[in-house]
Amino acid sequence: MKIIAKKDLFINDEIRVREVRLVGLEGEQLGIKPLSEAQAIADAANVDLVLIQPQAVPPVAKIMDYGKFKFEFQKKQKEQRKKQSVVTVKEVRLSPVIDKGDFETKLRNGRKFLEKGNKVKVSIRFKGRMITHKEIGAKVLAEFAEATQDIAIIEQRAKMDGRQMFMQLAPISDKK
């Protein structure tokens, strides 16, 4: 199991260099020491010798409790994953000739998505000759944006993509 992504840490007998720049338990510099002496110091303190900078000249080794270090590192990564929020984009599909009741239902769903912290893509699909009346679709999108302006901001203005017009809304708390 790797604990640090792109590089492996060498510990104790895995270290294959002649001398190291030694860092103590509390982070103090102990100077450049032969590997055997550095391992003896680590053994005397009953902890591990970990090569933390193998590309440095001379390589940097630190005296530390490797098990504790690994545990703390994994704990820190777990906390970072918890804090990371996944933003999903939900879609609400409308029609240029949508009825008031249907519009209210779609609006309610869009508001629910926004309150949960999701972004909302509002799209209108033009069928047949409706494509000639793009202003009707733009009016419906503007009405939707106006009805959600208290909890959302327009992240992407209304634009055409083939036979579809869409805009994207983001929750206000997301932008603070």
Curated annotation (Swiss-Prot):
GO terms for biological process: ribosome disassembly. One of its GO terms (cellular component) is cytosol. It holds the Pfam family IF3_C. Keywords: Cytoplasm, Initiation factor, Protein biosynthesis. It is found in: Cytoplasm. GO terms for molecular function: ribosome binding; translation initiation factor activity. PROSITE patterns: IF3. Gene3D superfamilies: Translation initiation factor 3 (IF-3), C-terminal domain, Translation initiation factor 3 (IF-3), N-terminal domain. IF-3 binds to the 30S ribosomal subunit and shifts the equilibrium between 70S ribosomes and their 50S and 30S subunits in favor of the free subunits, thus enhancing the availability of 30S subunits on which protein synthesis initiation begins. Belongs to the IF-3 family. Monomer. PANTHER family: TRANSLATION INITIATION FACTOR IF-3, TRANSLATION INITIATION FACTOR IF-3, MITOCHONDRIAL. This is Translation initiation factor IF-3. It comes from Streptococcus uberis (strain ATCC BAA-854 / 0140J).
